[in-house]
């Protein structure tokens, strides 16, 4: 019984470490791709806070990753006010998906 409990503790620790690593990697990628020039995680800049984007779209299913990745690469207008988001064609489709997954991970647990 003690062994099973120990394994659960180790597994939980690995999950927490993995989530923290994803947060760091996502933020690093967002900085590297210049997302942070217009966005912040928790405060409005030119664009909406990424945490607000996460709250709006979280829990809407796995297709939301593709939707947000498309918005990152293709840009958009009208969803967050008058300022349009320019297309970020320098972001690869793979990096756009990673960014979208990271952004969605910023939503508070429900």
At which residue positions do the language-model features occur?
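Bacterial N-terminal signal peptides that target proteins for export
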Residues: 1-9
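Electrostatic cytochrome c docking/interface patches
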Residues: 18-30, 56-58
